A protein has these predicted regions:
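N-terminal alpha-helical modules
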Residues: 1-91
């Protein structure tokens, strides 16, 4: 299966996941999902660094920025693996 197709399938499946299950994930895991999603869909971080007083925005920016140079397909694969490890297995 093509990576992009599998990635889109995972995104569609996540829309149907119980929000309680997602809220039980640690902040670190949620941040990993976020950074791989952004790298997969946008590519390298293209926004200016937020002030550190905006803790959540800065944490997201830092996480995404850490993937600079990662290929979008590689980020899709990581996202898919996170889905399989943290959503499917915990079902």
């Amino acid at each position: 299966m093509e990576i992009a197709t599998e990635f889109e399938g995972v995104l569609a499946k996540l829309k149907g996941v119980d929000t309680d299950k997602l809220s039980n994930l640690s902040d670190a895991i949620k941040l990993d999902f976020y950074k791989y999603y952004k790298q997969a869909t946008v590519g390298d971080c293209n926004i200016p660094e937020p002030y550190t007083i905006y803790y959540t925005a800065h944490a997201k920016w830092t996480a995404w920025k850490s993937l600079a140079g990662m290929a979008q397909e590689d980020a899709m694969l990581e996202y898919i693996n996170y889905y399989k490890n943290y959503i499917i297995i915990s079902s």
